[in-house]
Amino acid sequence: MERIKELRDLMSQSRTREILTKTTVDHMAIIKKYTSGRQEKNPALRMKWMMAMKYPITADKRIMEMIPERNEQGQTLWSKANDAGSDRVMVSPLAVTWWNRNGPTTSTVHYPKVYKTYFEKVERLKHGTFGPVHFRNQVKIRRRVDINPGHADLSAKEAQDVIMEVVFPNEVGARILTSESQLTITKEKKEELQDCKIAPLMVAYMLERELVRKTRFLPVAGGTSSVYIEVLHLTQGTCWEQMYTPGGRVTNDDVDHSLIIAARNIVRRAQVSADPLASLLEMCHSTQIGGIRMVDILRQNPTEEQAVDICKAAMGLRISSSFSFGGFTFKRTSGSSVKKEEEMLTGNLQTLKIKVHEGYEEFTMVGRRATAILRKATRRLIQLIVSGRDEQSIAEAIIVAMVFSQEDCMIKAVRGDLNFVNRANQRLNPMHQLLRHFQKDAKVLFQNWGIEPIDNVMGMIGILPDMTPSTEMSLRGVRVSKMGVDEYSSTERVVVSIDRFLRVRDQRGNVLLSPEEVSETQGTEKLTITYSSSMMWEINGPESVLVNTYQWIIRNWEAVKIQWSQDPTMLYNKMEFEPFQSLVPKAARGQYSGFVRTLFQQMRDVLGTFDTVQIIKLLPFAAAPPEQSRMQFSSLTVNVRGSGMRILVRGNSPVFNYNKATKRLTVLGKDAGALTEDPDEGTAGVESAVLRGFLILGKEDKRYGPALSINELSNIAKGEKANVLIGQGDVVLVMKRKRNSSILTDSQTATKRIRMAIN
């Protein structure tokens, strides 16, 4: 109070007022503070003070021709007095209003194109639906998320080249546009932005938003795709969440999602082939996602998921140094260990050889629905702090950590034999054996683990063997926390190696990933995934395998035909016939193959015997390892549409139908392509060549017994008659000539006679 009174007294003296309002401030420190540098020290004050003046704005002299001196209300818009220290005009804020109402208009056509990301965001929000607000504890964990919906996936350098080329095409500097996406985008944007009057710098900024993925490390409780992240501030607080459904999709989320599905399908398929690594690479290189080559997407897309990372490792790309076990991403935060192989007995007295990690280590574990911090020593879990969305998710994390700890009581909790196999029917390694076992049923594991009394610690509670919460007791070393554990934030990538069986190791030889870690979850891709590789034919079921196999033969018929006659073994070993084998009943595979190969050999031996349609039809059956047997077949079975369907060795069937008139083949009613050559030309030669040395007497005559196959004819004595099966299942009566002299004329007459006999 005293001070205020004193000030009042001072202010009442006119001299004080004069000093405060008129004298200059000449204290150097103060002058320095407010005048050093270009940075405005008190922008709000400066703005208020400027706007209080009559003419706070300066403009180019040309403004005097473009704006009247006074507006309709007679208020002055600009001052005739020059701006001190420049040849600019002093302008009133009212001039801006006048300009906005009456000034020239420009074309707005480019705005939606340049500010595309903003316009699209408005649309998504307009069509999105916001649900109720729920108040509850939010378990948020920091994850690296994409904050920029609707972007392409160019690297900063690639984007820079595109932007320079589009916005400043005449600037000097070498720009190399190499990738397909760069070229497409550049062409598209140049067309869109012709005669664009928006400031080039603005256009460049907006293009950057469209081309480059921007990620931030943010606390998230719900969806992590970019259309959820853009409304993060609306959907989750510290103690509340609001339900939200986005009003649109964006390509980058679709690409991320479809990439994961494609990678999972490819890894699962590669796992069961003879050479998993080679197959995986072949599939990655021949697959397209939304019309873009998968390998290009893998090079640019930073998505971290087990299958995606295996594909990246196979391509020689760097990946994150964290490793995966039981679907959780483990990152070692401190400590170290050495590996030693030890043998131990399960509760069922089965011997397991396990690589034991000796030493103290700490890890963070991050999964889709639960996270944890794990501290362990050699074969001992010291502490596990876990948090998750629900009981089930927490239990999953606890099982993984218990198995990972390699504790003896976990191994002794095994009941029954461990004989889990992967898709290729190979036994899983011991750690994954244990994991699968307890994921099926962890009751014994939790019961045998042991419990301990707990102290009351803020934000932590105990969890009992039946997975119910408790404040008194808890599984030994295990606590449940309200707080999530953040994902590993570093974007550091390391060089890795991959072996034939798709196990990915870091340079120290630690396994980071293996196909066992790839999720079995099936999703539906948002973008079209086109697998050109024959190994992926079966992804759409048996029918697709059947159609694709025959389509492939017809497409490559010229090359196949030559191989068929010169190097059949090479042909039979082609991987394009692999998927087909799964359609042939196991018991019959070898017999069918032996039968078809013998038939083909006869066609080759007897010069000119060649029936295109029949070769195409039977070729896939010859690919299996053949069994030597005398079995003859009139039809071969394939398992499609849930049952066995028959392919007739001679003649058409619903499965394989060749239309002579249109020369088109339909497989299960689906068009499989057209034969370019005329099969009949080939067929004519077949019969004539086969029947050299025989006289054709006419149609089949039942008195001479059942129809013989072509190779059975050789057993006939000269002068004997027999029925014989030729070509597309027609039967004619023949007699073996008594003399060999007239054999040559047979081929010409045979062709004519067959036609007569058949018709």
Curated annotation (Swiss-Prot):
It is found in: Virion; Host nucleus. A motif (Nuclear localization signal) lies at residues 736-739. GO terms for molecular function: RNA binding; RNA-directed RNA polymerase activity. It holds the Pfam family Flu_PB2_7th. InterPro entries: Flu_PB2_2nd, Flu_PB2_6th, Flu_PB2_C, Flu_PB2_CAP-bd, Flu_PB2_middle, Flu_PB2_N, INV_PB2, PB2_helical. Keywords: Cap snatching, Eukaryotic host gene expression shutoff by virus, Eukaryotic host transcription shutoff by virus, Host gene expression shutoff by virus, Host nucleus, Host-virus interaction, Inhibition of host RNA polymerase II by virus, mRNA capping, mRNA processing, Viral transcription, Virion. Belongs to the influenza viruses PB2 family. This is Polymerase basic protein 2. The gene is PB2.
